[in-house]
A protein has these predicted regions:
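C-terminal hydrophobic helical "lid"/dimerization subdomain
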Residues: 1-2, 270-274, 318-368
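Glycine-rich beta-strand-centered segment in the early N-terminal region that forms part
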Residues: 24-38, 51-98, 103, 155-160
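Rossmann-fold dehydrogenase core element
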Residues: 280, 295-337
Length: 368
């Protein structure tokens, strides 16, 4: 058993607790990763607050990056010493996985949010030897070591800074993939992006890569809106001071070709649909608590408008994460501008700063 140090969510909506844990050796199809860093994502906080019913106590974290330390006997594509970014989990066996859409895996929710392996076990034990929930996105990377699978580990070139790339496995691939893999705007298109967090900012950068000539960002934070311009936005709207739908239609006279809702707010969801032109497509990527409802004008869809939900940017991580790294190398995806680093011991401060809007993408460094 490997000894590790982890942040554990023990109670609903309470600060995480730093504790020593034990981690079992990897099974035949698993790998043990020495975590170098892990991004903090909105979904981690939704689960901490039990918006998704993952059993507590639980080790969260799903934007991990690190070095492979051990591999199971059936692992063929990775060896100890490989650098990896960890992404979402999928079964690899269902029809969706076998036809190239693992983000629609029939066991997606179970694999990522069950808190255990499919057989009900978990490789994580507390200091008293009691099994606690983990396997979060098949990684639980708010820890110095994590068990993952070969499927959700993306091999990365060793000249790429490991501490930086973890968020590519979830939040950044979600925003960028929503644009490049799902909406697929043609050069010259217009897009409105609601929410200038990590997902929204990644979407801004991807919209510029795609050749959109009108990129409108809506948020409540002026500093974030200024940064949005720096990474590619052509227009910004502070929704505290302006009617966002009206302002968007003043910029794009007939409404925008595409919109992306990244806030998980039902009110903003309505605005993201209402600002569309005819036809137009709204992508929904905000991570709302289960049971959240929103209202829309059904008449909007009589004129060719489309609403599409986007999971993990409709990305195949082994293909898309390296693509994003290449865009970063070229200076076209400067996601490092979004990042602030924290030590694992400061995880609760990192979450507070993220929720307050002070920081866009916190990344936790592990002290080994």
């Amino acid at each position: 058993m490997k000894q590790a140090y982890a942040a554990i969510s023990r109670e609903k909506a309470k600060p995480l607790v730093l504790e020593c844990i034990g981690i079992d050796e990897p099974r035949a199809d698993e790998i043990l990763v020495r975590i170098v860093a892990s991004g903090v994502c909105h979904t981690d906080m939704v689960v901490r607050d039990q918006g998704y019913d993952v059993p507590q106590p639980v080790v969260l974290g799903h934007e991990g990056s690190g070095v492979v330390e051990a591999v199971g006997s059936e692992v063929r594509g990775l060896v100890p010493g490989d650098h990896v970014a960890l992404s979402y989990a999928y079964c690899g066996k269902c029809e969706k996985c076998l036809t190239g859409t693992p983000y629609y895996c029939e066991d997606f929710f179970g694999r990522n949010f069950r808190g255990t392996r499919p057989d009900g076990t978990c490789p994580i034990h507390d200091s008293h030897g009691k099994q606690i929930s983990g396997c979060f996105f098949e990684q639980s990377s708010f820890a110095t070591y994590a068990i993952a699978s070969e499927r959700n580990a993306v091999k990365i070139s060793k000249d790429v800074p490991l501490e930086l790339i973890g968020p590519l496995g979830c939040g950044l691939q979600t925003g960028a993939g929503a644009v490049l893999n799902c909406l697929k705007p043609k050069p010259g298109s217009s897009i409105a992006i609601f929410g200038a967090g990590a997902v929204g900012m990644a979407a801004v950068m991807a919209s510029k890569i795609a050749g959109c000539t009108t990129i409108i960002v809506v948020d409540l934070n002026d500093e974030r809106l200024e940064l949005a311009v720096e990474v590619g936005a052509t227009h910004t709207i502070n929704a505290r001071r302006e009617d966002s739908v009206k302002a968007i239609k003043e910029i794009a006279q007939a409404g925008v070709d595409f919109s992306l809702e990244c806030t998980s707010s039902p009110k903003v969801f309505r605005q993201a649909v209402d600002c569309l032109g005819t036809p137009g497509t709204c992508g929904l990527v905000g991570s709302s608590a289960l049971g959240t409802e929103g209202t829309i004008d059904i008449g909007n869809f009589l004129f060719g408008r489309t609403l599409v939900g986007v999971v993990e940017g409709q990305s195949i991580p082994s293909e898309f994460v390296p693509q994003l790294i290449e865009y970063w190398r070229q200076g076209r995806f400067p996601f490092d501008k979004l990042v602030q680093f924290y030590d694992l011991d400061d995880i609760n401060q990192a979450m507070t700063d993220s929720e307050s809007g002070k920081v866009i993408k916190p990344i936790l460094r592990m002290n080994h």
